[in-house]
């Protein structure tokens, strides 16, 4: 039995006593205890692939701040790693793949990994975290979106231009759709396995959907997000596991995402929550959307911006604050001040009381 079910109630647009809050990358390098754990583990993957350490890191922000959810400590690139692309990290450059997929032969060789063998460490982490949380707050599981994973798989790492995947979209769209369908199958299986292991809410991160033109987004990202929302088994009624579709730069597509079948849409700070709520039309909950850079501001500035964000949602939602989960519009950065996170969380709790 959950002692704090605010997140799940808000995602299902049910009444809550105040707006729930959690933060993308709430377990991360801005916390000195995270940096100490990483030094002990030796690497990011050394933490992510050890269920006990992944649990320790997942719980660190909850030991500091009264957050309303834990999110699994992992990486969006676990699926392609398990497909054989071999993930590694370069200091200062981020994730890379030793075996990117750039031709038909490589793409057709890909299959859906077995979730309890190749990705057992993720499921074990979910089980350990659920046990340690002991019903205090819900645990969020997650995956990267098919488009975002395909970007990394084809580019071989992060990119500014996305030249290789966009070239494939123009020159060999059928091949790219084949890859996206395979990855979508894997994402659905991955999220279902996390749910079976104990995840109580699920989020898909479409980090790079915003690099696409509207026409390309509607061809290469939206249909696959919709497939996930419609095909992922999440249960029924009060026991249904809510799904959040988050995208960077997805403001223009809120209405499309609201029609996908997901329970909630996460937006970044490039659209006002008032506008997003009007576009959503009461069909989904909304999550977001404070600019993470606000945390570089003074405590007074942070409180003011939190208030504006809460008010913006209510303004677009007929004066009601129901159906809103407070979050940042993207993940936190390593140089942010943990004390400012405390200010943010306290401000949400104080200013959103019903």
Curated annotation (Swiss-Prot):
Lyase among keywords: yes
Record GO biological process: protoporphyrinogen IX biosynthetic process from glutamate
Source species: Xanthomonas axonopodis pv. citri (strain 306)
Subunit relationships: Homodimer.
Protein's name according to its UniProt entry: Uroporphyrinogen decarboxylase
An example molecular function term from Gene Ontology annotations: uroporphyrinogen decarboxylase activity
InterPro entries: UROD/MetE-like_sf, Uroporphyrinogen_deCO2ase_HemE, Uroporphyrinogen_deCOase
Annotated binding of substrate, by residue: 25-29, 44, 75, 152, 207, 330
Residues with site note (Transition state stabilizer): 75
Enzyme Commission identifier(s): 4.1.1.37
A GO cellular component annotation in the UniProt record: cytosol
Localization per Swiss-Prot or TrEMBL: Cytoplasm
Pathway this chain belongs to: Porphyrin-containing compound metabolism; protoporphyrin-IX biosynthesis; coproporphyrinogen-III from 5-aminolevulinate: step 4/4
Primary gene name: hemE
Principal subcellular localisation of the protein: cytoplasm
Keyword annotations from UniProtKB, A to Z: Cytoplasm, Decarboxylase, Lyase, Porphyrin biosynthesis
Catalytic activity: uroporphyrinogen III + 4 H(+) = coproporphyrinogen III + 4 CO2
Protein function: Catalyzes the decarboxylation of four acetate groups of uroporphyrinogen-III to yield coproporphyrinogen-III.
Pfam name, any one: URO-D
Protein family according to the UniProt entry: Belongs to the uroporphyrinogen decarboxylase family.
